[in-house]
Amino acid sequence: MRGAAFAPPWRSAPGQSLGFTKPQSTRRAHPIESDTVRRMRASPAEYLRLDLRAHDLLRDVPLYDVSIVDLPGGGAGRSIADIRALESAAAPSGVANTIYGLRRFLGRVFGWDHVSIRPEDSRLSRLSERDRRDSEITPGTPVGSFLLLYQFPGEALSETRNATVHGYVCTALAPTASGYRLYWGIYVIPVSWLTRPYLIAIEPFRRILYPAMLRRIRRAWLAAYGATA
């Protein structure tokens, strides 16, 4: 998945905190912008009601944020593999590429990305034989700066680790009355003193990248399948 550096957002689950409160912006949001952001955020309760393997595998990892996008139509049998194909085919905007490039540059300068996942810290070793057998992609396959743990038809889980965070991204696709809903769940484990300032620093960029990414997927979905397919 693109954007690994910006995947960990800041929103702790009830009773879970890294010891600080996310600063509140004093800027008055434009009504359209505000509505877009609101519609792309899901309550943790809605996400946690889904029947996902990630809930058990990451039961001791804080869930920090859930983003959603509704995908109308699509027909029967759409899967995470379709979402990955659409995401790969839809090129990020110039702004997104600039932000990704800035993060890669800072990672090289400060050595953030020289830290790799130790086998004993990865959830890869916790996968069951059934997980490994049912995964459509070999568990442990590198995908950009992530390690793919599994990909099922309705769910995929990826893991990343650097000097700033140990994070997980769960993508889930659930059928709805009008099509499908894509969920993008983010989990974060603090790894050092850098985690806290890093998460604060990337929050403005994340507010740009996440909605843009989900809108890009939705446009690609509509182009591929149409709203009434």
State where each predicted segment sits.
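Hydrophobic ligand-binding cavity/cleft-lining segments
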Residues: 33-132
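Hydrophobic-ligand binding "helix-grip"
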Residues: 133-176
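Short acidic, glycine/tyrosine-flanked loop/strand segments centered on an H-E-D-like triad
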Residues: 172-194
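A short acidic/glycine-rich loop-to-helix N-cap element
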Residues: 188-209
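Short, highly charged C-terminal tails/helix-capping segments
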Residues: 218-229
